[in-house]
Every structure is written in structure tokens, then in C-alpha cells.
């Protein structure tokens, strides 16, 4: 793989040309008393995460929850109505009763706190079956993304939003907005940066992919998703501890940056891979790793569907280079991490542990093999599962 590095460009332009900033701080940008008599809408975990992504510019060029024209265009052709690449509609669903009562400026709440507002411009019917078929490639209610879609309200509100503050939450050291990540990249002088998206603890195969990529670029952004995930996924706080010990012991500090990615998982496989790549461009990243079954769940998507879908766009449209890697694993005969391209041995020689198998071992108090994950990571996971009882 040959990658040509720019000698001058440090940061790619955000999608749409400008990084959206919809932060409006109470007491600074407006008088909180203005909100006293406005209607309020409580957000779900996913919608609260979407509000943050919109407000900080992570979802540039979107300035709010999408309207009907963009909604249909995204579903039908993976583009906004103006032709800009975009793969998943970012909507604000409500019930019919709520839709009939909400208009104008609506204060958005989460956890009992005012977190932002939306200026409602449109209300339109959600095409749930159509959205499920096109975005998730299935209408199976067992699919977690489809289940969430079917459970939400039947009407979508559209309009520009304001975000009152960045919810740094449990990870204040690692929670950075796109503008803040861009500032770190610029300060470090990285001409090229690769991002790695994960919702799982990093095992040796992930480490291998990251370090191969790091041979080709100046910096690595380890960008774990910490928004809402499936109930059986490893909790975000445990994963972040695992990332910290891994980076402290096995990565060059000056060439790596750990920063959390506050989006919620949709488990939309190929479509979500595009969303993850485009949003990383907004964070100032030039390259994005897509491995096997990116953002997938169960057997709904083919192993490399999330790589092949990028052919729907011209490379210059994306503004970020996709690094496509095959499945990697430890081969006991080769004595190292390999891929099908480099290993001549059949699967009986390979050490491959599924997420389910890893969780079974941890619940049983078993030690994960060193060929699968670093001992420091294994210990973090073991302690976390032991504490759960």
C-alpha cells in the first residue's frame, strides 16, 4: 500500500467547507430566562448524542436534525438533497401527540437538564420500513438498529439546533470536540492522521492494524465510541481504561491521541462506516481504517460490505482516504499476527476469539491469552468483570 503524504496540508476542510459551531452557552450567549416559558422535549440517549454531534460540528455540514427532502435523499441515494455525501438520516423522532403540541423554539432536555433547543421548521412522517430496508438492509426487529427505529415516534421534527454545553461526562480528559482535536493535530504538526473507530477493547489484531497504519502516517487518533451501545457490549469506562494502559505501554506517546467519540451506535454496518469516516474528516483526520464487518452486528452484513460501499462515491467527494484491511488473527504456526494474504495455514492454526467467547471467558474468571490481547488489557477486563460478580 502506497500513501502519498502532503508536505503542506495538515488538516482537511470539514465536510461542507466550514466546521459547524452551534454552541450557545446560557448566561453568555443568551439569557436563560428566555427559556422559562418555552415547551420542552426530553431526548433519548441517541438523540442527546446526536445533539452533541450536531452542536460541535462533528456532523458538519448538518446544522440540525434533517428535513424531509434530506431525509428521503439520504435514504435513497446516500446524499443530502444538495448532493453532499451522507449515509444515515439524523432525525429527531417524536410521537404524533408530541408533534401536535410542539412548534417554534423547543427546549431539549436530557437527564432533567436543559441541554439545547431546536427551532422547529418541519414535521414529517417517518418512513420506517423504507428506512430500515435501505439503511439497515433488513426489517428484522431483532436487529438492534431496526428495533430502535421501530420503537421511536412516527413523526420527525426538523430544524437548526443549539447545544448549551459539551457534556464531558465520565471522560473529561479524553472528551474533545472536533475543533479541539483539530487543535491538537495542528499543534503536533501532523501532516496526516489516521483514525481508528472501535466499540470494543483493543485486542492484538486491532493493535496490528493501527501500527501498520501508523507506519504510513504521522499520527494515530484512537477514537472509541462511548455513546449508547448494545447491553452486552463492554461498558465504555472499562474500555477507556483498557485503551489507557495499552497506549501507556505499547504506543509512541507523541504520535498517538486518545479521544472519545460521543456518538451512539446504530449498528448500520456499511452505511455507518460512511458516517464514521465523514465525521472523522470533521475532526481533522486524513485517513480512516475500515476493517472487517465495520459497525456490524450478527450476520446481517457481509465481511467486507463496509469497505465495498465506499465505491459509491468518488474519492475526492469523501475528502478522507479509506484504509481497507482484511481480517487479521494470530497464527500459531506462523507465530505472529497475520492475515489471509500472508498466512498459508488453515483455520485450525488460527487463534480467533469472538466477542461472545471473550465475554464468556471473562465471566468465568479465565485469563485471555497473550496472543489475543496484551496482559495489561486482559487484567483491566478481568477486574471489571470480577467487580460485576
Swiss-Prot record:
GO terms for biological process: hydrogen sulfide biosynthetic process; sulfate assimilation. Pathway: Sulfur metabolism; hydrogen sulfide biosynthesis; sulfite from sulfate: step 1/3. GO terms for molecular function: ATP binding; sulfate adenylyltransferase (ATP) activity. It holds the Pfam family ATP-sulfurylase. Keywords: ATP-binding, Nucleotide-binding, Nucleotidyltransferase, Transferase. Coiled coil: none annotated. The keyword Oxidoreductase does not apply. It catalyses: sulfate + ATP + H(+) = adenosine 5'-phosphosulfate + diphosphate. Belongs to the sulfate adenylyltransferase family. This is Sulfate adenylyltransferase. The lineage of its organism: Bacteria, Thermotogati, Deinococcota, Deinococci, Deinococcales. The gene is sat.
Amino acid at each position: 500500500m502506497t500513501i502519498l503524504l502532503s508536505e503542506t496540508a495538515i488538516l482537511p476542510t470539514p465536510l461542507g467547507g466550514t466546521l459547524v459551531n452551534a454552541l450557545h452557552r446560557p448566561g453568555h450567549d443568551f439569557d436563560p430566562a428566555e427559556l422559562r416559558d418555552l415547551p420542552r422535549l426530553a431526548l433519548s440517549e441517541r438523540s442527546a448524542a446526536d445533539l452533541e454531534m450536531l452542536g460541535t460540528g462533528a456532523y458538519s455540514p448538518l446544522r440540525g436534525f434533517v428535513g424531509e427532502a434530506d431525509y428521503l435523499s439520504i435514504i435513497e441515494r446516500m446524499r443530502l438533497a444538495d448532493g453532499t455525501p451522507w449515509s444515515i438520516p439524523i432525525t429527531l423522532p417524536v410521537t404524533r401527540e408530541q408533534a401536535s403540541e410542539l412548534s417554534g423554539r423547543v427546549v431539549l432536555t436530557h437527564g432533567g437538564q436543559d441541554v439545547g433547543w431546536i427551532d422547529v421548521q418541519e414535521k414529517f412522517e417517518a418512513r420506517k420500513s423504507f428506512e430500515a430496508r435501505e439503511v439497515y438492509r433488513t426489517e428484522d426487529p431483532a436487529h438492534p438498529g431496526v428495533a430502535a427505529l421501530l420503537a421511536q415516534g412516527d413523526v420527525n421534527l426538523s430544524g437548526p439546533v443549539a447545544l448549551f454545553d459539551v457534556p464531558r461526562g465520565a471522560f473529561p480528559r479524553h472528551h474533545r470536540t472536533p475543533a479541539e482535536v483539530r487543535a491538537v493535530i495542528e499543534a503536533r504538526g501532523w501532516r496526516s492522521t489516521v483514525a481508528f473507530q472501535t466499540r470494543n477493547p483493543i485486542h492484538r489484531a486491532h493493535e496490528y492494524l493501527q501500527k501498520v497504519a501508523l507506519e504510513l502516517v504521522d499520527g494515530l487518533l484512537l477514537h472509541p465510541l462511548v455513546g449508547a451501545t448494545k447491553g452486552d457490549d463492554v461498558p465504555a469506562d472499562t474500555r477507556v481504561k483498557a485503551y489507557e494502559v495499552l497506549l501507556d505501554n505499547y504506543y509512541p506517546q507523541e504520535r498517538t491521541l486518545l479521544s472519545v467519540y460521543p456518538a451512539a451506535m446504530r449498528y448500520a454496518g456499511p452505511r455507518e462506516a460512511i458516517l464514521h469516516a465523514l465525521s472523522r474528516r470533521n475532526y481533522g483526520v486524513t485517513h480512516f481504517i475500515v476493517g472487517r464487518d465495520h459497525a456490524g452486528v450478527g450476520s446481517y452484513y457481509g465481511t467486507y460490505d463496509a469497505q465495498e460501499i465506499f465505491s459509491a462515491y468518488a474519492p475526492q467527494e469523501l475528502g478522507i482516504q479509506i484504509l481497507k484491511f482484511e481480517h487479521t488473527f494470530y497464527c500459531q504456526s506462523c507465530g505472529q499476527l497475520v492475515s489471509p494474504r500472508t498466512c498459508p495455514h488453515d483455520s485450525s492454526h488460527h487463534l480467533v476469539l469472538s466477542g461472545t467467547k471473550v465475554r464468556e471467558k471473562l465471566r468465568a474468571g479465565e485469563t485471555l491469552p497473550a496472543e489475543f490481547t496484551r496482559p495489561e488489557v486482559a487484567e483491566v477486563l478481568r477486574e471489571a468483570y470480577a467487580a460485576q460478580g
